[in-house]
Each structure stands twice: as C-alpha cells, then as structure tokens.
C-alpha cells in the first residue's frame, strides 16, 4: 500500500453494491487501477469519476485488491466531446482500446500522454476519425504487433505503390507483388498514410486532411489488421461500426424537424 498523487484518466465506472462505485482509472504514475468509491453516485467524487474526465488524484494504491481515492484537484472534462454523440463514441472507444492495450498496474506514461493529447485535439475539433486511426496504428505495438509500412519486405525500397501481404506481414513493391497471390490489393495511399501515421508528431496532426472515401478504405484495412493480429472485439468499437447508419437516420430526422 502506498500514498500517491498522480494525474489520472477515468476509463469507466460501474455500480457496486447499493450506493458505491468501482472506478477504473488510468494513472500516469501507477498504471491502470480499480478504485472503490463509497457513495460514488452522490458523494464528493461523483462528478469527477465520470468517464473521460482527467484530474490530479490523491490516492491510496494497493498492489492487490482495490485502491482508494482520498481527494482530487484540477479536474478537467471534454465538453465538446461529451456533447457530440460521434466524438463521444470515438473517445469512448479510445479509452476502451487503452484499457485493452496494457495490463493493470503497468506504468506507461507515454501512452497516457498520447491518449490525453489525442482527446485534447479531438476536443479542439480535429478529425476524430483520423485521430482514432492514428491512435490505433501507434498503439499496435502495445499488443506486440510491429508492422513496417515504410518499405518492401523483400528489397527494402521505399516510396513505391505498395500493397500489404498478411503472408509476410509487410509491404510488397510492384516487383514483388507475385510473391503473394493473396495480397490485399490496397489503394497505395492506404499504406502511405499508415506509414505517416506511425511517425506523426502532435503538431503534424493539425495539418492532416483525408477525404471520406480514403477514410473508408483506412477504416476497412485497420479493422482487418486488428482482426488478424490483435483479435479483440470491443463493444465500443461495434457501436462505432453501427454509428454511421443510424447516425445518418438521426440526421435526416433532425432536418425534417
């Protein structure tokens, strides 16, 4: 058991017994921990323990069992995200993906900073779909998946119209397409963008602009990568998959009003 002060991100909370809450917090100093909050639905902590909030927490951290929040300060929320069903859905997915990417108790300050900055940019109005794609690609290594979208897996040439091979877990240049008759037949811009996504700085994110058709192709291929190499199926991702169809219906109804 140790007393600790750390910045923390609320991943989720759930009811526990009658009036209490269990709260999963990704802390910068102690990794992901489950916290017990007595009277969580109506007590002092009720506002700060809502998903996607960030604060400085004073806490008691236990290596085994539940940890406890003693106090908090500097609470922040993402008002633009939580007021938009689309942004909220994507942000919730990023939180769930973060939860899946590392084990509880593993300190990962770099991932914490990346998640926080991604949500800050989403809050500022940057493209939430592309921000999500970039996050998905850069977090792959947390699942033990390391893919090279920069060069041909055979001759290591760069800057060519590449395709992806699951057989070789890498790119094929035109001279080596025949090495895999079941290659992906991608639009060459897909691996080009994924190569950029792997190394983008936060400032470069502000200048990224991708057309809708290319977004669709990126979404399809990244889904295939996760199916083939990661194998997780998150409820929040399934919700996003259905979002465009019923979201379009909602939009039509709003226009009718």
UniProtKB/Swiss-Prot annotation:
Sorted UniProt keywords: DNA damage, DNA recombination, DNA repair
GO biological process: DNA recombination; double-strand break repair
Record GO cellular component, one term: bacterial nucleoid
Gene3D superfamilies linked: Nucleic acid-binding proteins, Recombination protein O, C-terminal domain
InterPro entries, per the entry: ARFGAP/RecO, DNA_rep/recomb_RecO_N, NA-bd_OB-fold, RecO, RecO_C
Pfam families the UniProt entry points to: RecO_C (PF02565), RecO_N (PF11967)
Highest taxon of source: Bacteria
Key word DNA repair present: yes
Family: Belongs to the RecO family.
Function comment: Involved in DNA repair and RecF pathway recombination.
HAMAP family listed in its UniProt record: RecO
NCBIfam families referenced in this protein's UniProt entry, alphabetically: reco
Protein's recorded name: DNA repair protein RecO
UniProt organism field: Streptococcus thermophilus (strain ATCC BAA-250 / LMG 18311)
